[in-house]
Amino acid sequence: MNKIESITEDLITPIVEAEQFELVDIEFKKEGPHKYLRVYIDKPGGITLDDCQKVSEGLSKKLDEADPIVENYFLEVSSPGLDRPLKREVDFLKFKGEMIELKLYEAIDGQKTIEGELVGLIDDKIVIKISETEEVEMPREKVAITKLAIKF
């Protein structure tokens, strides 16, 4: 997490907790000529547009007061989507038994993507079941992105 994301987390946590939402992720990224501060929130039953607006307005006010971002940027508050990232230990507990996708920094046996059922997070290793008889333990430092797999 970079400095802006960390400051944003400190500013938004009281807003999210007051509404009993879950803070899923924060990203500060440059895309083309623009910079985006993206905040992903969730709650049981899903986030509504009104929920996003409420959090966006509260965070925008706090960001204006603290002024941690010097350059121009767009603030976006949304749900994490169907392919939400799994980053915190609580995410791995919450989605145990779900299909996930690991994107690796470097290919292993010619593969940079592994998909399987999340067994858990054990000793900082992501454990997934890739077949009825095979489980894989992948150290988190080898994984660039862990996210829920979209099922069609």
Swiss-Prot record:
Q: Where in the cell is it found?
A: Cytoplasm
InterPro entries in alphabetical order: Ribosome_maturation_RimP (IPR003728), RimP_C (IPR028998), RimP_C_sf (IPR036847), RimP_N (IPR028989), RimP_N_sf (IPR035956)
Q: Which Gene3D superfamilies match?
A: Ribosome maturation factor RimP, C-terminal domain, RimP-like superfamily, N-terminal
| An annotated GO BP | ribosomal small subunit assembly
Top-level taxon of the source organism: Bacteria
- Key words of the record: Cytoplasm, Ribosome biogenesis
One Pfam family recorded for the sequence:
RimP_N
Q: Which GO terms describe its cellular component?
A: cytosol
The protein's job, in short, is:
Required for maturation of 30S ribosomal subunits.
Name the family the entry cites.
Belongs to the RimP family.
Q: What is this protein called?
A: Ribosome maturation factor RimP
Give the originating organism. Alkaliphilus metalliredigens (strain QYMF)
The beginning of the lineage is:
Bacteria, Bacillati, Bacillota, Clostridia, Peptostreptococcales
